[in-house]
Design a protein with these regions (language model features):
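Core structural elements
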Residues: 191-204, 309-331, 342-360, 372-374, ...
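Small-residue helix-packing motif on alpha-helices
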Residues: 168, 319, 345, 391, ...
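Strongly charged, low-complexity linkers/loops
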Residues: 364-375, 379, 388-458
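Extended, non-catalytic structural segments that build the interaction scaffolds
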Residues: 289-296, 333-340, 374-386
C-alpha cells in the first residue's frame, strides 16, 4: 500500500516597516535612491558609531503584536547575530533572539472546507535589513548598495501549523491585510516590503514527530510560494520513497525553472553566536505606552464589513472584495464622502476597476485614480453629459493617469449629443442606408434594432444618447 504523507509548514515573514527613517539612525528609507546615498556611519558599520532605536519601529511592532493577539514583552533587549557577508557591513545584524517584542499570538484563517483554523505565531521580533548585492552585469565582481542597510523590519515567525499551500496563502493574506490596515507597511511582495521564507517538512500521515525541514527562499509572489511548496513537497517525498534522507538546508526557488537548488546547510541559532547588544539600552514598554498604541488601532476588516452592511447597503460580495484591500476601502469611502452614491461607487470598483486590474495584473494597492476624479466621472454620467461607453473610455485613461474627467471631456469633445433634431437626422440617414435591417425589424426580428442603434452611435462617434436613439428609431420604424 502506498504511503500517505502530510506536509508541515511554518513561515518566517519579514515585513519592511513604513517609517521615514531607518531603525537605528536618521537615514532615509525611501526606495529608489542612487546607490549608497541613504547611508551614514551607523548603517554602514563604521567604528565608534552608536545606534539609537527609532521609537516608531517599536510602536509598529507592538501594534502588529496586539492585532495578532500576541503577548507584549514589557522588558526586552536587542541581540547581535554574527555572520560575515559583504552586504552586512558590521559583520553582525542587530536582531532579537532572547527577548522578542511579541510572543504567543495567532490569527484565524478560513480553510478550504469553509471552516476556520488558528495559525499560531511563535514570536515577532524587530531587526535591521542588510544591504543589497548586485551581481548581474559583471562576471568578475559584485557591487553592494547599502541604502537598504538598517531599514527596519519585523520578522513574524509562525508555529508549524500549516498543512497546505492554500493555508499558507490564507495566512499571508490575513497578515498582509492586518499590517496594511495598521499602516505599518504596504506589504508588497513584488517590491520586497513583505518577504516569506517557507520552512517545510513531510512526514507519514499519523506520525507525531516532525520530518527534516528545509527553508525555501527567493519567494516574491503568492504564485511562487504555492509552486515552491508543491515542488518541495514532491522532492522530499521522492527522496523518502527512494529510501534516502532529507538534508536540513536552505534552498533557493527558481520560479522560471520550477525547481529549487541547495544554497547552504541550514544554520541553528548557536551558529550565529548571539549575544546581547551592548550599545543599545533595554526596551521598557510601559502601561501608558500600550494604552496609547491600543487607542490608535484602526477599524479592522471585520468591523468595517459590518459597518458597510448597515451604512451603505451594498452586496456582501462587493463588501468582501472592497474591504479585502485597505487602499480600495479607503478609495471607496473617500469617493462616497464626496458624491454620496455608495452603490454607483461600488459598481465602478467591482466592474471596470477589477477588470482592468486583472488585465494589467495589478494589486489594489497600486490603484492611481483619486476619489475626486471618480466622483466627477459619476457626476458626468448622472447628468447625462456622457454615455456609458464614453464613461468607460474615460475611466480607462483615468486608471492609468488619474486625469480630470471633466477637463478630458471638454478637451476631447466627448460631451453627449442629446439634441433631438440632430439625432433624428442621423437616425433617418441610418434607416435609409440599411433597408435590410429595417425590413428585418418590421418582420419581427427585434435584434435588428440593436444593429441600427450601433450604426447611429458609430455615425455620432459614440457621443449619442443610446436611449434617445432607441426611442427615435422605434418611433420612425
Amino acid at each position: 500500500m502506498a504511503k500517505e504523507y502530510e506536509t508541515v509548514i511554518g513561515l518566517e515573514v519579514h515585513v519592511e516597516l513604513a517609517t521615514r527613517t531607518k531603525i537605528f539612525c536618521g537615514c532615509s528609507t525611501a526606495f529608489g535612491g542612487e546607490p549608497n546615498t541613504h547611508t551614514c556611519p551607523v548603517c554602514t558599520g563604521m567604528p565608534g558609531s552608536l545606534p539609537v532605536l527609532n521609537k516608531q519601529v517599536l510602536e509598529y511592532a507592538i501594534a502588529v503584536g496586539l492585532a495578532t493577539d500576541c503577548e507584549i514583552t514589557r522588558y526586552g533587549k536587542f541581540d547581535r547575530k554574527n555572520y560575515f557577508y559583504p552586504d552586512n557591513p558590521q559583520n553582525y545584524q542587530i536582531s532579537q533572539l532572547y527577548l522578542p517584542i511579541c510572543r504567543n499570538g495567532g490569527v484565524e484563517i478560513e480553510t478550504e472546507d469553509g471552516g476556520t483554523k488558528r495559525i499560531g505565531i511563535h514570536e515577532i521580533h524587530m531587526e535591521e535589513d542588510a544591504g543589497k548585492l548586485i551581481h548581474d552585469e559583471w562576471e568578475d565582481c559584485s557591487l553592494v548598495d547599502y541604502n537598504r542597510s538598517g531599514v527596519p523590519l519585523i520578522e513574524i515567525v509562525s508555529e508549524p501549523d500549516m498543512r497546505s499551500a492554500a493555508e499558507v496563502i490564507a495566512y499571508l493574506e490575513k497578515l498582509r491585510l492586518i499590517i496594511q490596515y495598521l499602516g505599518a507597511s504596504d506589504c508588497k511582495l513584488q517590491e520586497g516590503s513583505m518577504r516569506a521564507d517557507v520552512n517545510l517538512s513531510v512526514r507519514e500521515t499519523g506520525q507525531k514527530s516532525f520530518g527534516t525541514r528545509t527553508e525555501m527562499k527567493n519567494l516574491n509572489s503568492f504564485k511562487a510560494i504555492t509552486r515552491a511548496i508543491e515542488g518541495e513537497r514532491e522532492r522530499q517525498i521522492d527522496i523518502l520513497e527512494e529510501g534516502g534522507q532529507v538534508i536540513q538546508e536552505t534552498r533557493r526557488w527558481d520560479d522560471t525553472k520550477g525547481e529549487s537548488y541547495a544554497m547552504r546547510s541550514k544554520e541553528d541559532a548557536q551558529d550565529y553566536r548571539y549575544f546581547p547588544d551592548p550599545d543599545l539600552v533595554p526596551i521598557v514598554v510601559s502601561e501608558e505606552m500600550l494604552k496609547e498604541i491600543k487607542a490608535k488601532q484602526p477599524e479592522f476588516r471585520t468591523e468595517k464589513m459590518a459597518r458597510y452592511r448597515t451604512e451603505y447597503g451594498i452586496p456582501d460580495y462587493d463588501i468582501d472584495i472592497i474591504t479585502g484591500s485597505k487602499h480600495m476601502a479607503d478609495l471607496f469611502e473617500a469617493t462616497v464622502a464626496i458624491c454620496n452614491q455608495p452603490k454607483k461607487v461600488s459598481n465602478w470598483l467591482m466592474g471596470e476597476t477589477l477588470r482592468l486590474m486583472k488585465e494589467k495584473d495589478m494589486d489594489a494597492e497600486d490603484l492611481r485614480f483619486s476619489p475626486e476624479n471618480l466622483s466627477k466621472l459619476i457626476r458626468l454620467s448622472d447628468a447625462r453629459a456622457i454615455n456609458s461607453s464614453v464613461a468607460k473610455e474615460i475611466f480607462e485613461v483615468m486608471f492609468e493617469e488619474d486625469i480630470n474627467p471633466e477637463r478630458y471631456v471638454e478637451e476631447k469633445g466627448l460631451k453627449m449629443v442629446s439634441d433631438e433634431g440632430a439625432l433624428r437626422r442621423t437616425v433617418e440617414e441610418v434607416i435609409a442606408n440599411n433597408p435590410q435591417s429595417v425590413e428585418d425589424y418590421r418582420n419581427g426580428k427585434e435584434k435588428a434594432i440593436g444593429f441600427l442603434v450601433g450604426q447611429t452611435m458609430k455615425a455620432m462617434k459614440g457621443k449619442a444618447d443610446p436611449a434617445m436613439v432607441n426611442q427615435i428609431l422605434k418611433e420612425l420604424l
